[in-house]
Amino acid sequence: MARIAGVDLPRNKRIEIALTYIYGIGLSRSKEILEKTNIDADIKCQDLNDQQVVSIREILESNYQIEGDLKRFESMSIKRLMEISTYRGRRHRLGLPLRGQRTRTNARTRRGGKKTVAGKKKAPRK
């Protein structure tokens, strides 16, 4: 099992798909990496030799921000927005949608579960 960037890649998948298990690498970036290293995309992960794994690691370390570095960068960007009190930063702080979606109804994913509020009670008749 190849271990790249702290992630165990699945042995029985094609290397093109297996690379997408690394945070920050999608299918197009995976294809780009394999082109640079001259590795066939149809090879199974278990069939890679050590030299091919090393070449993939070198390209990832030198050219791309992945895994922990990328997560840290994203969280720092959000913190910066919150510190300078931009609209997006305030929405992050309040846990609301950032991009203009309606919040009177919907937005359940961002706001959390449904909170029932008691309605008006009818006065009893005399």
Curated annotation (Swiss-Prot):
<dbReference type="GO" id="GO:0003735">
    <property type="term" value="F:structural constituent of ribosome"/>
</dbReference>
<keyword id="KW-0150">Chloroplast</keyword>
<keyword id="KW-0694">RNA-binding</keyword>
<keyword id="KW-0934">Plastid</keyword>
<dbReference type="InterPro" id="IPR018269">
    <property type="entry name" value="Ribosomal_uS13_CS"/>
</dbReference>
<comment type="similarity">
    <text>Belongs to the universal ribosomal protein uS13 family.</text>
</comment>
<dbReference type="InterPro" id="IPR010979">
    <property type="entry name" value="Ribosomal_uS13-like_H2TH"/>
</dbReference>
<keyword id="KW-0687">Ribonucleoprotein</keyword>
<dbReference type="GO" id="GO:0015935">
    <property type="term" value="C:small ribosomal subunit"/>
</dbReference>
<dbReference type="InterPro" id="IPR001892">
    <property type="entry name" value="Ribosomal_uS13"/>
</dbReference>
<feature type="compositionally biased region" description="Basic residues">
    <location>
        <begin position="101"/>
        <end position="126"/>
    </location>
</feature>
<dbReference type="GO" id="GO:0009507">
    <property type="term" value="C:chloroplast"/>
</dbReference>
<protein>
    <recommendedName>
        <fullName>Small ribosomal subunit protein uS13c</fullName>
    </recommendedName>
</protein>
<dbReference type="GO" id="GO:0019843">
    <property type="term" value="F:rRNA binding"/>
</dbReference>
<dbReference type="GO" id="GO:0006412">
    <property type="term" value="P:translation"/>
</dbReference>
<dbReference type="Pfam" id="PF00416">
    <property type="entry name" value="Ribosomal_S13"/>
</dbReference>
<dbReference type="InterPro" id="IPR027437">
    <property type="entry name" value="Rbsml_uS13_C"/>
</dbReference>
<dbReference type="InterPro" id="IPR019980">
    <property type="entry name" value="Ribosomal_uS13_bac-type"/>
</dbReference>
<comment type="function">
    <text>Located at the top of the head of the 30S subunit, it contacts several helices of the 16S rRNA.</text>
</comment>
<keyword id="KW-0689">Ribosomal protein</keyword>
<comment type="subunit">
    <text>Part of the 30S ribosomal subunit.</text>
</comment>
<keyword id="KW-0699">rRNA-binding</keyword>
<feature type="region of interest" description="Disordered">
    <location>
        <begin position="97"/>
        <end position="126"/>
    </location>
</feature>
<dbReference type="GO" id="GO:0005829">
    <property type="term" value="C:cytosol"/>
</dbReference>
